[in-house]
């Protein structure tokens, strides 16, 4: 939303077909294409820890440094995940996260946070979150800002949840492993880069085509098992971006056509896991 509201021109890149994350090869190709055209100047890269799976930050950071770009980590689904021993939310020049209830660390309403180790950026963010306040106080507005302060109630909700976050991430790994064992070789499963730990904000698989996906979703609905598509439309073809040319991003398009998510929570009972596994396997 901020990218659009700040009149930035977005240039979407494709995802990797196995991790579903930003493809460093596609990214560099897009950067070179924009530079060669000469009309626009790339300024920043936004990398998403999609579904809780850490993006490839070594490669992305090297590309950003090569071309003098800011790297922004969207860790909304990645809180609790780690990339080569380093927690998500600590990469790039700026990292953002969400505390929406469906996220790995969620409150009971809306909330979020921005992380940076740059003092100038931090001071600017403190201004933006309180209506664009200046050094003289909150009524000294020096820029157009937002009302984006996390309220005390939501912070209080998250404190005990933060204390058990690592435990919940470990529980998510156990359930993901059960799903992996059950569906391996039958559906395309999420691939986690070596040395990384996914937060598994959701557990999504790819059917072979839309017809198979629909059969699976219908079977789950008949068994009163919830399911969702994360997400049905690639970002670059949303109506909000209609003024911009829709690039050909085949991996993103295939993911949107074939993905589906099954119930997933650190507290999902083994009985419920068995029901999910049994119902999906019956349609394969």
What label would you give each PLM region?
Residues 15-20, 77, 233-234:
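Short, acidic/turn-prone active-site loops that include or flank metal/cofactor-
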Residues 25-40, 44-48, 53, 57-59, ...:
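PLP-dependent aminotransferase class I/II
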Residues 90-129, 152:
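Active-site PLP attachment segment
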Residues 19, 54, 73, 78-80, ...:
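Catalytic P-loop NTPase motifs of RecA-like helicase/translocase cores
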Residues 73-108, 137-142:
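Conserved active-site segment immediately N-terminal to the catalytic lysine
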Residues 1-9:
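Short, small-residue-biased leader/transition segments that mark boundaries at the very start
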